[in-house]
Amino acid sequence: MKIAVLSRNPRLYSTRRLVEAGTQRGHEVVVIDTLRAYMNIASHKPQIHYRGKPLEGFDAVIPRIGASVTFYGCAVLRQFEMMGVYPLNESVAIARSRDKLRSLQLLSRRGIGLPITGFAHSPDDIPDLIQMVNGAPLVIKVLEGTQGIGVVLCETTKAAESVIEAFMGLKQNIMVQEYIKEAGGADIRCFVVGDKVIASMKRQAKPGEFRSNLHRGGVASLIKITPEERMTAIRAAKVMGLSVAGVDILRSNHGPLVMEVNSSPGLEGIEVTTGKDVAGMIIEHLEKNSGPNQTRTKGKG
């Protein structure tokens, strides 16, 4: 197979590993800088050009699209789909998963466990919004944030009111969530490929911190997940329409709660922690499922 990897930086661990795994399995793997691919949206013959030449003959595309380039990255991926190239994750699913609020709305509709979450526009509604999520302590998240940036833990109602007011004053969209104290600053990253959790790790926040992101100094370790956690992760990825996803789960007193479904999960943490060949399993998934015009989008965008 000829596989395109959409990535801005070929030196990133995840990109390198995907190229390595694909090459080892006898495929031709080409890294394409997402922002240098440009499109000709012509009737009957959609094209993508890259550094002056048309891209042709690809069987599959692996999107590694950073949050900051979601809009353009999804447009490039959609163009690949229009050309009948099989995407590891579809453009609509990636766009959907990047919208934190929409993701939670979709997950809640399917009855997947979530922390109680509030969303409001007017400062007049702040007191009731805080009550809605069972009062302080609570967590405030900027909708566009990644890697734990723009996430605030408010210990008191007074602090929560001030922070929410400040964000609203800055015209920032935020959501307010109950704080799951019993999780103890830890979450579980379940790595879903197809309809299986192929690897999972526990991420523990460093002392005095509540965000367990590895980018924030969290520490990863091996963990055995429960059948309920496994099922929750698989269902969450399915609801989002993602073939490959990193599903972040909190252990609460009332079962597993999904924090986030990540459409471009990093490979380094999970491979180093578990010793599993996650990149190889992703390529294997492509081998089994890819084929011309296999996208569910069917060129309808």
From Swiss-Prot:
GO terms for biological process: protein modification process; SOS response; translation. Disulfide bonds: none annotated. It is an enzyme of class 6 (ligase). Transmembrane segments: none annotated. Binds 2 magnesium or manganese ions per subunit. The keyword Cell division does not apply. Signal peptide: none annotated. Residues 104-287 form the ATP-grasp domain. InterPro entries: ATP-grasp (IPR011761), ATP-grasp_RimK-type (IPR013651), ATP_grasp_subdomain_1 (IPR013815), RimK (IPR023533), Rimk_N (IPR041107), Rp_bS6_RimK/Lys_biosynth_LsyX (IPR004666). NCBIfam families: PRK10446.1 (NF007764), rimK_fam (TIGR00768). This is Probable alpha-L-glutamate ligase. It comes from Pseudomonas entomophila (strain L48). The lineage of its organism: Bacteria, Pseudomonadati, Pseudomonadota, Gammaproteobacteria, Pseudomonadales. The gene is rimK.
